[in-house]
């Protein structure tokens, strides 16, 4: 096996180098502390329901609508066919997942997790809608309507919508200083999952009238958002859009961003206090050096009034992200499908042009030697030397040809032999792999859901089944966490996590 080039402490100067380069192989102090923390906090074998009373901004038990979970698990009002639950094998997961969505419901939108993430996040909401579909179709549509109601005039749909104030998250509305959305929002976006969810809800809808009405209303907003991507992030018409902030990628501290982020010169920042570290062990979160740069970019964009042309030209971080581009391409396929269902033939041709261009452009991101797709740094023009779980997402996008798909399946099989649970977010043989640190190693249910969808589309059903069963086992054994250690299975990050719950429902109750 060819070892990828590693960002070692000696190849990166100064303090930053030592903080970006990790030493999971020997196990540094951070890593050991995090493992001890994870095993102390992991929920033991029986999956638990979230506590109903909550500090943390959670609604009081008395404010919750009365819930008869057993009855709901039995009468599935969306009509989705229970997949493997005839034996009741997954009834505890179903029950807990539904309860999590209800407890994280803030009225038309779902927060990802109490305390840690108290607002509406973009791709979280789009994926969570798929979970809501198994409880309440109307509520599933509302999730998407609420997200798209925050759309900016230029078409962008922001990465966070600040519906109500919260002291538990930083940086909040006062730092972003954007007034475009009625309730305030960030000034960047996230991977555009929404059109994919609209198609799925539309296809599985029982209430066809509601589905047609809502999809027809949402369609122009989705089209405007996709147009924004090409105007704002691909002004040269390459077929691949740029990502200007690691938060836009959704895979915030991916090793793929290390070198590009290291080149962002840190501004003189006002003093700040990270609230995430009050909720989660610091060894499971991005490092300070990364946060300083995240904030530097936020202030840079704010000072440019979030003007889309200025941002593209002045951002000191600009990459071609596989996750965003795979999701955008898949979303275009689904948007085109929707255009045909609702009689928007006028949009069909425009979307077809995007699809054709991207289909070809994706080949420039395939690394035949590594047998995986890679991101590109747009400021250096170089392919980024990091194999991450995003490298499998071209399967979800359907842009891989059959030989590329076979190579990806083989790569995935090699990765699975190195860890107990797949899919790790970074190649487990890479020295940058850290099994508990957020997007640098842990398993994420949402990524697994997209990878399994892609594997099945290319006929790798058995491999898809393995990844799906790994995820359900993780949840069953450890709880519905934000992410999981691929080596030990320990749950990490936030607990009672909405999109993990939603993916379980989407898998177990899939139509
Ligand atoms: O760490 C954070 O504060 C936020 C910033 O957007 O990102 C994480 O959390 C968000 C909420 O779950 C996700 O959408 C992102 O992909 C990421 O996992």
Where are these regions (language model features)?
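Low-acidity, Ser/Thr- and Arg-rich intrinsically disordered low-complexity segments
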Residues: 5-11, 18-26, 35, 39-41, ...
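Bacterial Sec-dependent signal peptides at the C-terminal "C-region" and cleavage site
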Residues: 21-28, 61, 71-74
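N-terminal polybasic/positive-inside topogenic patches
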Residues: 39-43, 60, 79
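Extended glycan-interaction surfaces of carbohydrate-active proteins
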Residues: 80-120, 146-184, 238-320, 357-443, ...
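Extended, well-ordered alpha-helical scaffold segments
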Residues: 89-97, 136-149, 208-229, 331, ...
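Alpha-helical support elements that line or immediately flank enzyme active sites
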Residues: 125-155, 390-401, 448-461, 468
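Internal, well-ordered domain-core segments that constitute the primary functional module
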Residues: 193-255
């Amino acid at each position: 096996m060819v070892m990828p080039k590693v960002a070692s402490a000696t190849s990166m100067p100064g303090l930053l180098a030592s903080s970006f380069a990790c030493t999971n192989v020997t196990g540094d102090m951070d890593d050991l502390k995090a493992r001890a923390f994870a095993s102390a906090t992991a929920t033991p074998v029986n999956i638990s329901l979230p506590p109903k009373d909550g500090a943390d901004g959670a609604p009081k038990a008395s404010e919750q609508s009365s819930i008869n979970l057993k009855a709901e698990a039995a009468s599935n009002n969306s009509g989705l066919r229970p997949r493997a639950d005839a034996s009741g094998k997954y009834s505890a997961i179903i029950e807990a997942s539904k309860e999590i969505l209800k407890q994280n419901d803030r009225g038309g939108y779902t927060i990802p997790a109490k305390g840690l993430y108290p607002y509406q996040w973009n791709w979280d909401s789009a994926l969570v809608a798929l979970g809501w579909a198994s409880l309440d179709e109307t509520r599933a549509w509302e999730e998407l309507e609420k997200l798209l109601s925050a759309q900016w005039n230029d078409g962008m749909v922001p990465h966070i919508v600040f519906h109500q104030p919260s002291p538990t998250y930083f940086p909040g509305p006062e730092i972003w200083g954007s007034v475009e959305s009625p309730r305030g929002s960030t000034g960047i976006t996230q991977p555009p999952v929404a059109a994919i969810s609209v198609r799925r809800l539309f296809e599985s809808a029982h209430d066809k009238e509601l589905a047609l009405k809502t999809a027809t209303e949402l369609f122009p907003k989705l089209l405007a958002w996709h147009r924004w991507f090409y105007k704002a992030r691909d002004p040269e018409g390459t077929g691949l859009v740029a990502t200007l902030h690691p938060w836009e990628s959704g895979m915030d501290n991916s090793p793929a961003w290390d070198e590009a982020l290291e080149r962002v010169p840190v501004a003189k920042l006002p003093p700040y206090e990270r609230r995430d570290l009050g909720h989660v062990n610091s060894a499971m979160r991005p490092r300070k050096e990364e946060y300083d740069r995240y904030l530097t970019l936020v202030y840079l964009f704010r000072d440019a009034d979030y003007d889309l042309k200025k941002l593209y030209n002045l951002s000191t971080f600009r990459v071609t992200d596989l996750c965003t581009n795979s999701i955008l391409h898949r979303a275009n396929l689904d948007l085109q499908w929707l255009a045909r269902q609702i009689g928007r033939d006028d949009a069909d041709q425009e979307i077809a042009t995007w699809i054709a261009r991207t289909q070809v452009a994706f080949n420039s991101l395939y690394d035949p030697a590594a047998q995986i797709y890679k991101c590109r740094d747009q400021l250096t023009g170089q392919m980024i030397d990091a194999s991450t779980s995003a490298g499998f997402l071209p399967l979800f996008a359907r842009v891989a040809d059959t030989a590329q798909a076979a190579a990806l399946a083989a790569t995935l099989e090699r990765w699975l032999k190195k860890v107990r649970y797949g899919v790790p977010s970074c190649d487990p043989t890479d020295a940058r792999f850290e099994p508990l640190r957020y997007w640098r190693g842990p398993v994420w249910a949402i990524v697994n859901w997209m990878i399994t969808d892609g594997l099945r589309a290319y006929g790798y059903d058995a491999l898809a089944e393995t990844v799906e069963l790994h995820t359900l086992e993780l949840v069953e054994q450890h709880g519905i966490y934000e992410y999981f250690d691929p080596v030990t299975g320990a749950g990490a990050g936030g607990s009672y996590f909405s999109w993990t719950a939603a993916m379980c429902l989407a898998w177990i109750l899939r139509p």
